[in-house]
Amino acid sequence: MPKTQTLEQTKLSEPKMYKVILLNDDVTTMDFVIEILMNIFHQNLEKASQTMLEIHHNGSGICGIYTQEIALSKQKKVMDAAKLANFPLQAKVEEE
């Protein structure tokens, strides 16, 4: 008698996505924010300038949307770079 094999189907769901948000402050320079957006979030100069102005005018701005692990990694990179440059720039991660 031939062996039969049952294949189990597993439904994969999309991972939860998280927004990385930069918060405006009165000390961090616009140039530094643009540098962060280009180096950590890989935005080109035009997009980085637009995002920086959104942060400046609205108090915060979304820099990107990622899986949780990547979002937290980018948040840490922002915080580390800001600390190294003696800026109080803050980043937060929120579920989308």
Swiss-Prot record:
Give the record's GO biological process terms: protein catabolic process; proteolysis
Q: Which SUPFAM superfamilies match?
A: ClpS-like (SSF54736)
Quote the subunit structure annotation.
Answer: Binds to the N-terminal domain of the chaperone ClpA.
Recorded protein name is ATP-dependent Clp protease adapter protein ClpS
Function, as annotated: Involved in the modulation of the specificity of the ClpAP-mediated ATP-dependent protein degradation.
Q: Which PANTHER family match?
A: ATP-DEPENDENT CLP PROTEASE ADAPTER PROTEIN CLPS, ATP-DEPENDENT CLP PROTEASE ADAPTER PROTEIN CLPS1, CHLOROPLASTIC
Please report which protein family the annotation says this sequence is part of.
Answer: Belongs to the ClpS family.
